[in-house]
């Protein structure tokens, strides 16, 4: 009985603490038309302290979404265009000799920002990708002999263009796994596109985005997200989903046995649990339900399941495999 009361109290507390989510959504909605999934993905990544890999053709408001979020959170934003000639020093910074001081001084790179847009990450060679991914993992960078912490909150939004593969350097599986979420951005609906065109033709310019929350508030909100209740049955459900990617036959998914080259790692289980918690929080609920897990499952697992040559030959996608798993794993 006491647990029920505690859950009720927790739910009321989360409802109070998550009021800013709707305010943030409304503020971003002034500029971003539609793309609710993209906005939710950004919020989940921000609240879970995870990074996001976005896949979508150019012109779908990826840059606009993260710059708008940065303005609404009153945070520092930086955009890095990845090119074949980019060097790690262009990203993290370097030591510059100062004739005035007769000593080397640190010039910090664009990675020192709260929100970093890594545009077309697969356009740069492995050493540059590694520099970014190390910064993402450690949340600090080394320049010369000194290590410098990155500002908090720190969110990397990396983009890949699915159409142009010529002259690209695909991210290795181990490095892709560092991204908590991989979201696919789709085209807007007809009415949404009409609204976008009207907004850009009105001559009034883009609406002003106001600061509605501070970076410190985001860090406090992360602590609150950790208090969102997750029942043991939900934990088991998450573990079952991940194990179904490794041992599909145990879940009556024999047909997937020859289609999956490798499944999700323990990092996938952690990411799925954290993302489900954050999803419950942005839905202003103090406890996780199976629908929260299912809502974030595709984004968490999309880049963590390797396909065999057989699956690729049959044009089977990870989307279909994840859907099959969700349809077969018993929901608590």
Placement of each model-derived feature along the sequence:
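Walker A/P-loop
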Residues: 46-83
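P-loop (Walker A) phosphate-binding loop of NTP-binding proteins
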Residues: 57, 91, 159
């Amino acid at each position: 009985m006491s647990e029920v009361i505690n859950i009720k109290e927790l739910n009321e507390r989360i409802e109070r603490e998550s009021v800013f989510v709707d305010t943030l959504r409304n503020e971003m909605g002034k500029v971003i038309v539609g793309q609710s999934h993209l906005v939710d993905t950004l919020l989940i990544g921000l609240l879970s302290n995870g990074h996001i890999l976005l896949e979508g053709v150019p012109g779908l408001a990826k840059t606009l979404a993260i710059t708008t979020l940065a303005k609404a959170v009153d945070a520092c934003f930086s955009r890095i265009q990845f090119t074949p000639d980019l060097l790690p020093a262009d990203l993290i910074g370097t030591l510059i000799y100062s004739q005035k001081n007769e000593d080397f001084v640190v010039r910090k790179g664009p990675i020192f920002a709260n929100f970093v847009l890594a545009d077309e990450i697969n356009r740069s060679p492995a050493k540059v990708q590694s520099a970014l991914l190390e910064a993402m993992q450690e949340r600090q960078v080394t320049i010369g002999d000194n290590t410098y912490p990155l500002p908090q909150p720190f969110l990397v939004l990396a983009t890949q263009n699915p159409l142009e593969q010529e002259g690209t350097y695909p991210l290795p599986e181990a490095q892709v796994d560092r991204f908590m979420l991989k979201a696919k951005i789709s085209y807007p609906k007809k009415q949404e596109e009409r609204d976008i065109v009207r907004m850009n033709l009105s001559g009034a310019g883009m609406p002003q985005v106001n600061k509605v929350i501070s970076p410190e508030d985001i860090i406090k909100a992360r602590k609150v997200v950790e208090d969102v209740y997750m029942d043991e049955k939900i934990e088991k459900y998450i573990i079952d989903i991940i194990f179904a990617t490794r041992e599909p036959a145990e879940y009556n998914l024999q047909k997937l046995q020859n289609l999956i080259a490798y499944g999700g790692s323990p990092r996938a289980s952690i990411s799925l649990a954290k993302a489900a918690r954050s999803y419950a929080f942005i839905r202003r609920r103090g406890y996780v339900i199976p629908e929260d897990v299912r809502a974030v499952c595709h984004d968490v697992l999309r880049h963590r399941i390797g396909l065999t040559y057989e699956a690729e030959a049959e044009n089977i996608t990870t989307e279909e495999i994840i859907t099959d798993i969700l349809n077969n794993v018993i929901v608590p």
